Regions:
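Ligand-binding "clamshell"
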Residues: 91-103, 116-118, 191, 196, ...
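Pocket-flanking alpha-helical
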Residues: 66-97, 119, 204-206
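Short, polar/charged alpha-helical segment
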Residues: 29, 37-59
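Short helix-initiation/N-cap motifs at beta->coil->alpha
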Residues: 60-71, 158-187
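Flexible hinge/capping segments at coil-to-helix
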Residues: 24-26, 115-134
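Alpha-to-beta junction loops
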Residues: 74-84, 128, 151, 172-176, ...
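Ligand-binding clefts/hinges and TM-proximal coupling segments of bilobed small-molecule sensing domains
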Residues: 136-162, 242-268
């Protein structure tokens, strides 16, 4: 009987020891949602390795739209996401009574005006249709890009982060605007002829930033962020995410594999 007890104790110790080792090997799991394309790549190849060095087990979940990543984060299915700017996040919070918080900017691919019909801005004919993002924040980016290109003039009284057609005081080429979900905009380059495509969707569709007729002059508020739940502000996870983005390893990957991305000023 004494031998059986000793055997059982020994077996239990081995099981417990194995469980502890497995937990230590896996580390704390952190689940990050990212839009398909360059930001999923950034999460996988620039952010994940640094977090794993910090002891985390990292899971990356890819999304093909701008709706699911915030819903999943607000519902607790994600610990963080990487796809949006602060204005988009604030709009989601207001509309959904959520408490998402941005913690650090990341290098961001600029929006570009792409065309299958015209080779230069000067070639654009009067009355041409232009596709641009449906959501107000990113459509504002589109309008500002058109203004910087000299195609339209926006009223000085306009809210630069909520521009609509009523704010356009000069439309030199009588452009007509078609609003679409951001994920459809790469296809609109061929279907419509002119399309303002956010950089992440352009790259995900194997378009080159250099092929755009013009690229946006990115406002600080339009740079993408890592976003977490308000309850996690002040947590070790928040600190580790910030440290990962600020790390030399992260920025080496950005410099090598994400050329053309607009970097936060402190990183330039």
């Amino acid at each position: 009987m004494r031998g059986i007890i000793i055997f059982l104790i020994g077996t239990l110790a081995v099981i417990l020891g194995t469980s502890i080792l497995l937990y230590e090997d896996e580390g704390e799991v952190i689940t990050i949602g990212a839009s398909s394309g360059p930001f999923a790549d950034m999460a996988s190849f620039a952010l994940k390795p640094v977090l794993e060095e910090q002891g985390y087990s990292v899971e990356i979940v890819e999304y093909s739209d701008y709706i699911q990543p915030n819903n999943a984060l607000a519902n607790g299915d994600l610990d963080a996401n990487l796809f949006q700017n602060v204005l988009f996040m604030e709009s989601f919070n207001e509309e959904n009574d959520a408490d998402l918080k941005n913690i650090i900017q990341v290098p961001t691919a600029p929006m570009g005006l792409y065309s299958s019909e015209f080779s230069t801005l000067e070639d654009i004919t009067s009355g041409s249709e232009v596709a641009l993002p449906l959501d107000p924040v990113n459509s504002s980016r589109g309008f500002l890009t058109l203004q910087d290109a000299g195609l339209i003039t926006i009223s000085e009284d306009a809210d630069m982060f909520a521009i609509d057609e009523a704010d356009i005081i000069n439309n030199k080429k009588n452009l007509e605007f078609i609003y679409q979900d951001a994920g459809q905009l790469p296809r609109s380059v061929e279907q419509i002829g002119l399309s303002l495509v956010p950089g992440n969707f352009a790259l995900a569709s194997e378009m080159k930033l250099d092929d755009a007729l013009t690229l946006e002059n990115m406002n600080e508020n339009f740079r993408n962020q890592i976003v977490i739940n308000g309850d996690d502000i002040g947590s070790k996870m928040e600190e580790d995410l910030i440290n990962a983005v600020e790390s030399e390893e992260f920025n080496e990957v950005i410099d090598a594999d994400f050329k053309g991305f607009d970097k936060p000023e402190e990183d330039e």
